């Protein structure tokens, strides 16, 4: 994450564990101050799904949290107004001796944000690498047989999104796999756009899976949270099917050209450097080699 986000808040690993030196230096007073600053009733929203009523729910909440008062200090806000590093195509190889497989993860930060309407973006990715029948998986798994599975996806945040491609491949085909990934992306944003069959499969798949996404209370809750988290209209899930049905191949191709840009993806490879490093020259990308503990 720091490789693509730099000093941006999203550059902190998603695990939330932070930096060991910083954690070791924290005091109980600092933790309490952070809790008081952020965990407060005027900065909270409650979502409830179940066999209940608003009156019953409010009564229970008042009983449990009625005495919880907001502090006098202003409610804090998060800022994402931090530039990310300019995209720079390269490979970072992390040496893991004797690994029979290599794990490849390539990523770039997109200009689009989670609060944008990304229906077309997600549909375009589904064709490229977001489903089992995607081009990336069909190439590396079904045609080449170098991987049990390869995929691409858009990592969702409120602010800047990340496009990522991932594959676990046999060690002696690491370099070739990166070449094929680049080839698929290049073709997708070039002359090898979305076919009629791919468009139909993507539309039908997304529309037909909608009912199954709300079979449980937890699924309904997740939909409610997403609407609020990403500033979506209340009727988002009622209108999304029509958005899928109106998709065109030209829309998907244009969105792909705007987002899946060839030539500026950072690849991180975990594998046996003795086997993998000699293969990286054929990718045409600059690379560095590091030990896992660096």
Show where each model-derived region lies.
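Non-catalytic beta-strand/loop surface segments
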Residues: 1-43, 67-115, 126-175, 197, ...
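Generic long, charged, amphipathic alpha-helical segments
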Residues: 150, 181, 202, 220-225, ...
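Extended amphipathic alpha-helical segments enriched in small hydrophobics
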Residues: 167-195
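Helix N-cap motif at beta-to-alpha junctions
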Residues: 50-55, 170-174, 272-274
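Small-residue-rich helix-loop
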Residues: 200-207, 211
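Solvent-exposed, non-transmembrane alpha-helical starts
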Residues: 59, 113-118, 174-178, 278-279
